Amino acid sequence: MQRGYVLCNYDLSQVLCLTPEKDGVVLHDVTSTKVLNKAMCLPDLTEAKNVSQMLQDKDLTGDLEIVNVARLYKKFF
């Protein structure tokens, strides 16, 4: 179980994860806690904002929301 902040879409149905090669990012549907365990989880809000801005500047992602991963785990527990 992770803790910290993740980047997800506005309806909280997809979460940002690293690709298996760890050279890019992809949005995965939040269907189980296994997906949340694979999510790119950042320890603090400042770091999450910096990563979000960097990804937007490089046009790798669109607008994403920063949420506490515990909020997503509540869907399953």
Task: Name each model-derived stretch.
Residues 1-38, 64:
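Short aromatic-glycine-(Arg/Gly/Cys) micro-motifs in beta-strand/loop hairpins
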Residues 36-77:
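Short, mixed-charge low-complexity intrinsically disordered segments
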